UniProtKB/Swiss-Prot annotation:
Localization (cell): Cytoplasm
Binding sites annotated in the UniProt record for FAD: G7, A8, G9, L10, A11, G12
Source species of the chain: Thermotoga petrophila (strain ATCC BAA-488 / DSM 13995 / JCM 10881 / RKU-1)
UniProt keyword list: Cytoplasm, FAD, Flavoprotein, Methyltransferase, NAD, NADP, Transferase, tRNA processing
HAMAP family per UniProt: TrmFO (MF_01037)
Name of the gene encoding the protein in the UniProt record: trmFO
Cofactor(s) this protein requires: FAD
Protein name as it appears in the record: Methylenetetrahydrofolate--tRNA-(uracil-5-)-methyltransferase TrmFO
């Protein structure tokens, strides 16, 4: 049987790669570059449209634990990320183009995967096995088809991305290199005095934004709040939030600045840097004006402006079973952010999980839940089985895991034990039920 995968984002790429490398025939549909979305820039698979950071690799961080589990199951996302890595302190950050190119080439090299560069606006639900992994920027044509198939069980939220500037346009006379608490020198830090901070805050509060249809502040995703919305919540909100100076010492003064705008490398050559936590929906001319309030960015060349977009996802607890299959048509799977998981790694992990169970089904075996002691198992169980009311997008966090049998007072020690238990549970599971 051929597995039809719609969408070559992180989740769809994991499905296609993990099945294709095991000899399963896959047809992977991707409409880009023939038809682009409002947030994508290339035709590569697994293009990262928000941040270039894949977050922590430390297992005492929920994102790090998730990666450790994904490595055990096998992940093209993490294989490509290693080849595209750029310096970013304790976080795993990548050169977007190298990363997406690595994923694309790995999938296109598989003989059992046929890549079809066409938009899918409909398909026969009765024919074959389908995996819908079109992400939050699902095209209007397919969205209409899915709405007819699923009913009105669609939800949405808004998120935004940050501007990117060229390194050569950053005035390093007004900036310094360093990570928090002296743990590296991978970030460019733009210190602000109290007067400069107030000027920036006022500019953000007063700036004009791009109006969006159906926009509702209650639907802003918490990890991608536009910086102007944070600014409007209070004068000090930014310097206790994305512009906090904690652990950053300006070598010119020997002190922590009043506030700091951090810049993170976007590419291996270090030509481009993004503003950390500076997601925005300001009009483009306003973004220019606001950035000029930051001393080291007074002459910055903006190569990508911040934008906001609406993300669509389905009401998974109502529509899907624990294996991410449609309850009423179990030959149709969903994977990625369209299911309500939030985050790059979470999306990729859901693709691995779907691929694992599709593989089992095609081999005549029953699909399996992952252990709830694992971050992957706990996240997917939450999305499908434990939500009360409408689903809100959920990302990996230690609060999803069942408690330890013995109490550990120290937060770090507790997370370490939870992580060790999760990794051991995943190892045992894969030993008993391998691909």
């Amino acid at each position: 049987m051929i597995v039809n995968v719609i969408g070559a984002g992180l989740a769809g790429s994991e499905v296609a790669y993990n099945l294709g490398k095991r000899g399963i025939r896959v047809r992977l549909f991707e409409m880009r570059p023939k038809k682009m979305t409002e947030v994508h820039k290339t035709g590569y698979f697994a293009e990262l449209v928000c941040s270039n950071s894949l977050k922590s690799e430390d297992i005492t961080n929920a994102e790090g634990l998730l990666k450790a589990e994904m490595k055990l199951m096998g992940s093209i996302t993490l294989e490509a990320a290693e080849k595209a890595r750029v310096p970013s302190g304790k976080a795993l950050a990548v050169d977007r183009n190298i990363f997406a190119k690595e994923v694309t080439e790995a999938i296109e090299s598989l003989e059992s995967v046929e890549v079809i560069r066409e938009e899918v606006t409909e398909f026969d639900p009765e024919e074959g096995l389908w995996v819908v992994a079109t992400g939050p920027a699902t095209s209007d044509g397919l969205f209409s088809f899915l709405r007819n198939l699923l009913g009105d069980d669609f939800l949405f939220f808004f998120d935004a991305v940050s501007p990117i500037v060229t390194f050569e346009s950053i005035d390093m006379e007004h900036a310094f290199w360093g990570d928090r608490f002296g743990k590296g020198k991978d970030y460019i830090n733009c210190p602000l005095t109290d007067g400069e901070y107030e000027e920036l805050w006022k500019a953000l509060v007063e700036a004009e934004v791009i109006e969006m249809e159906d926009f509702d502040r209650k639907l802003l995703f918490e990890r991608c709040q536009p910086i102007e919305e944070i600014a409007r919540s209070g004068k000090d909100a930014l310097r206790y939030g994305p512009l906090r100076p904690t652990g950053l010492v300006d070598p010119r003064t020997g002190k922590e600045p009043y506030a700091v705008v951090q810049l993170r490398r976007e590419d291996k050559e270090g030509r481009f840097y993004s503003l950390v936590g500076f997601q925005t929906r300001l009009k483009w001319n306003e973004q220019k004006r606001v950035l000029r309030k930051i001393p080291c960015l007074r002459n910055a060349e903006i190569v990508r402006y911040g934008v906001m977009h609406r993300n669509v996802y389905i009401n998974s607890p109502k529509l899907l079973d624990i294996f991410f299959r449609l309850k009423k048509q179990p030959n149709i799977f969903f994977a990625g952010q369209i299911t309500g998981v939030e985050g790059y790694m979470e999306s990729a992990a859901s693709g691995i999980y779907v691929a694992y169970n599709v593989y089992r089904i095609l081999k005549g075996l029953s699909p399996l839940k992952l252990p709830e002691e694992t971050m992957m198992g706990a996240l997917f169980s939450y999305i499908i089985e434990k939500v009360e009311g409408d689903l809100k997008p959920m990302y990996a966090n230690f609060g999803l895991l069942p408690p330890l049998k013995t109490r550990v007072k120290d937060k770090f020690g507790k997370r370490k034990k939870l992580a060790e238990r999760a990794i051991e549970a995943m190892r045992k599971f894969l030993e008993e039920y391998p691909w």
